[in-house]
Structures are given as structure tokens and as C-alpha cells.
Amino acid sequence: MLIIACPGQGSQTQGFLLPWLEAYPQLEGNLASLGKACGADLVRLGTTAEEEEIKDTANAQRLIVGSALAVYRSVFAGVKVDGALGHSVGEYAAAAIAGVIGDHEAMQLVAKRADAMAEAAAKTPTSMAAVLGGEETEVLSAIEQFELEPANFNGSGQIVAAGAKSAIQRLVESPPDKSRVIELKVAGAFHTSFMESAKQSVAQLAESFSPVDPEINLWSNVDGGLAKDGSAFLSSLVSQISNPVRWDKCMTSLSGLGATVIELPPAGALAGLVKRGVSDATAIALKTPVDVEKVPIS
């Protein structure tokens, strides 16, 4: 079983698209088309843009989803893929790969999402922090104690907390027992109630689309379950903006399938989580075009 994993925000690195553009000439046209749909120069962002520019939420989300889709269309054209899933904004790429929405529709939604989340983040000083290790019940208790919210359940003993920046700093200073806390370099408290205004903004645009049911297996960040209804999955993309990412449940769903999980660029984080959390899966991160040779496709 061949499954495509689409990365989330924070995976991008300066110039990561350069080797892909050299190896796949058609990629530039794909990126240009997707960039036009979302109002961004994806080729420049993925090649010559400075690191600070691609860290910006408005740019990062466009670049990550656009790159994943462009590489997928260039590398996997004609390849039978059995399923797809994404982490956070990566779900928009997964939705397009599964045929629920078109590539350009995905980019339009991502553009609205990125801008709305950046705007919401600018209203209040908020942040996020990864809690590594510790007992889950104790970690969640500490998150609640500091009036924070769990934003990501990544599995492998990693939960991301989010909320007021001052509260995040207190959590860093007083980590739960047997854990360490690392503040993340992000613009705000994504996947929490602080993003409610962004959710409403994206919902208005989503209402104008006509999604269809997925053509392949498509797992949801809501509960790790398989999506059957395209309209319901699109609604879940919207609701997830202010709700936690349950990547842990996605990995539970992958367990027992004996799947080969291919992470699209910018790759690395999800493949690492799958390697640690799904014992019978083979995870391949497409960091450079050389990694495509590892994929069992003909």
C-alpha cells in the first residue's frame, strides 16, 4: 500500500526546491500555475527567498502546500497511490491528491487560511511549545493549569501546547515531570480558540466550493478516521483551524497496514514520526530527487 503524506508548517527550509527544479523541468510550470492561484511566486519562495520570508505564515503555508502538490503531480503522474493524509495545512494538499477539491481550489483555500491565521495571530501575543516526553495525563494537566490548549498530538511522546505567550514561557520554565518543553518559532497559537476568526473567514470561501468524495483512502486530522464524504472532509479542514491536530490517531490508523508512507517535500518531520510510531510501516522522506529512487514505483 502506497500512501502519500503531506507536511505541515515549519518543514520548509531555504532553497529546498532548487534540486527539484533541476531534476524535474516541468515543476516550474506547475509551481507557477499554483502560485497564480494563491497570489504568490512559489518558485522564488522555494529557491532564493530568505529564511525569514518563508517563515512568515502567509508565505509558509502557500509554499508548503504548493510545493507538495507540484512535486506530486510531477513525480507521481500515472502512479497508483492508495491513500493520502496531511499534517495541519498539509491536509489541503492531501484533499487535492484524493480528488476532494482541485489543486487550484486547495491553493485558494490555503491563501485565505494563511492570511486569516496571520491576521488572527497578530491580534494577541501568542505562541506554541512542544512538550517532549512525560505522561500524557500529566502533560495535559499542566497545559490546562497554565490556561493553554493542546494544539497538536504528534505521537511518539510529543504534544504541542499553544496559547498566550506569557503562559507558554511559564510552561517552558516549569515543565511537566520527565519532560522538556521547547518553544516553537511560530507566529501564534494555531489550532486553538485564538484562531476562531480565521476559521470563520475560511468557512465563507469554502462554502463556494463543490467537493466530491475522495477517490482514494484519505485520513483526517480530526480523529484519524477515513473520510468517506467530501463535503464533510472540507468542513473538517475548516474546523481544524481552531481545533487540535490528532496526528497520533492518524498513525494509529496506519498501523497494521504494512504501508509505504512517502512524505512529499519539504520532507522529514512526518517520516520521522511514522518511523517511530508505526512499527510495520516503511517511511520515505523525499528530501531531494535522489530519494525518489527509494520509492517502490514503476
Regions found by a protein language model. Give the residues of each.
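Amphipathic coiled-coil/heptad-repeat helices and related helical stalk/stem segments
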Residues: 246-247
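Short, charged, surface-exposed secondary-structure boundary motifs
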Residues: 194, 291-298
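Short, high-confidence coil segments that cap the C-terminus of an alpha-helix
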Residues: 178, 258-259
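FabD-like malonyl-/acyl-CoA
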Residues: 1-138, 184, 261-290
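C-terminal alpha-helix/helix-terminus motif
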Residues: 206, 278-281, 296
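Small/polar (Gly/Ser/Thr/Ala-rich) solvent-exposed segments
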Residues: 254
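Alpha/beta catalytic cores of group-transfer enzymes, especially the acyltransferase/condensing modules
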Residues: 9-11, 36-38, 98-242, 272
